[in-house]
């Protein structure tokens, strides 16, 4: 992956720290903090930034936690301050509704990731079609993409495209993939999608591979890359966007962002907001090693405290069971069963 074969390639960066970062903050980011971060990202030239509850539209719930404000309040506050960046949202069919997407659009959102499990694209046609009807930049987002092979991802991506998705994402929700895994899936998509349909990659840094995987995605044909300034996100965080931007600049990949401003946002704005340093630790490394949905990290830690079973053991078991997003309630059940089998008394 030398400068020569990627020099001049144009890539669109999409920041996730105000949506995926909500997971790391237990959904506790204030409207004022949202605006402060978003305006700084806008000034640094980030073209897209995602603003919602960590679980997206409809995410405020007992299962996923309650944020400090509604999605509409967050979106409206941020969108009204943007000079060039577009605000995006996450929508998981079955959790978020078309009514909530309309409300997000009315508040100022202009882009949407319509997210399904990597084998369930057929749950998204109505939501994708509605997003297109609204005139939104519309992405089909295939979560936990490591659980489907390249041919399967291509098939699911073609479905997303047929519903109206303008971009299809390979989404490494568990931070499990290695560069060869990403390359195979992106190439398979590029072979079947129409030339005008873009391909994106969303990585997590649980194995420390976020940047390498994103570069592999670009080399295979991706033109959109998700990341998070200072890596603020679920698990060990998303691909750290300021580091990725620096690598792109070294390689001659054109992102259109101001690297030094992005570095300053990470150091001066995001890091002071962190409740804990988002890094590859024992548990987040286990997420990547075992292929577990990154959002499960804090849920597993809470279950470990309650039932006296190490979080790492719980995560390995969740990986063995191939648990996916939306099954958060099963984490407590799994930990309780493991504690019973081990004869451990709950706290």
Swiss-Prot record:
Keywords: Aromatic hydrocarbons catabolism, Lyase, Manganese, Metal-binding
Family, as annotated: Belongs to the 4-hydroxy-2-oxovalerate aldolase family.
Molecular function GO terms recorded: 2-isopropylmalate synthase activity; 4-hydroxy-2-oxovalerate aldolase activity; manganese ion binding
Signal peptide: none
PROSITE patterns: PYR_CT
Protein name: 4-hydroxy-2-oxovalerate aldolase 1
EC number: 4.1.3.39
Active-site residues annotated for this sequence: 23 (proton acceptor)
Ranges for domain Pyruvate carboxyltransferase: 11-263
Organism: Azoarcus sp. (strain BH72)
Residues at the site labelled Transition state stabilizer: 19
Catalytic activity, as annotated: (S)-4-hydroxy-2-oxopentanoate = acetaldehyde + pyruvate
InterPro entries reported in the protein's UniProt record: 2-IPM_HCS-like, 4OH_2_O-val_aldolase, Aldolase_TIM, DmpG_comm, DRE_TIM_HOA, PYR_CT
One example of a Gene Ontology biological process annotation: catabolic process
């Amino acid at each position: 992956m030398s400068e020569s074969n990627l020099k001049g390639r144009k890539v669109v960066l999409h920041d996730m720290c105000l949506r995926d970062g909500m997971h790391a903050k237990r959904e506790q980011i204030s409207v004022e903090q949202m605006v402060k971060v978003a305006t700084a990202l806008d000034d640094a030239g980030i073209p897209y930034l995602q603003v919602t509850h960590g679980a997206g539209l409809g995410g405020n719930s007992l299962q996923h936690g309650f944020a400090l404000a509604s999605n509409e309040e967050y979106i409206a506050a941020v969108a009204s301050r943007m000079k060039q960046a577009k605000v995006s949202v996450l929508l998981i069919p079955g959790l978020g509704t078309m009514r909530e997407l309309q409300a997000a659009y009315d508040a100022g959102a202009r882009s949407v990731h319509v997210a399904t499990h990597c084998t369930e694209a057929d749950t998204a046609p109505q939501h994708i079609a509605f997003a297109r009807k609204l005139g939104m930049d519309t992405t089909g987002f295939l979560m936990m993409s490591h659980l489907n092979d390249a041919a399967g991802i291509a098939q699911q991506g073609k479905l997303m495209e047929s519903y109206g998705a303008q971009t299809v994402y390979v989404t490494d929700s568990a931070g499990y993939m290695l560069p060869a895994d990403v390359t195979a899936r992106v190439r398979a998509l590029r072979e079947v999608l129409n030339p005008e349909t873009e391909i994106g990659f969303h990585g997590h840094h649980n194995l420390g591979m976020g940047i390498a995987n994103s570069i592999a995605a670009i080399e295979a044909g991706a033109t959109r890359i998700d990341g998070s300034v200072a890596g603020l996100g679920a698990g060990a965080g998303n691909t750290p966007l300021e580091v990725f931007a620096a690598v792109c600049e070294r390689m001659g990949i054109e992102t259109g962002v101001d690297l030094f401003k992005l570095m300053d946002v990470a150091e001066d704005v995001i890091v002071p907001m962190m409740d804990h340093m988002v890094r590859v630790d024992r548990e987040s490394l286990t997420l990547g090693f075992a292929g577990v949905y990154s959002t499960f990290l804090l849920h597993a830690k809470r279950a470990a405290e309650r039932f006296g079973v190490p979080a790492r053991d719980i995560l390995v078991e969740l990986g063995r069971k191939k648990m996916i997003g939306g099954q958060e309630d099963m984490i407590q059940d799994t930990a309780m069963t493991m504690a019973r089998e081990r004869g451990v008394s709950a706290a």
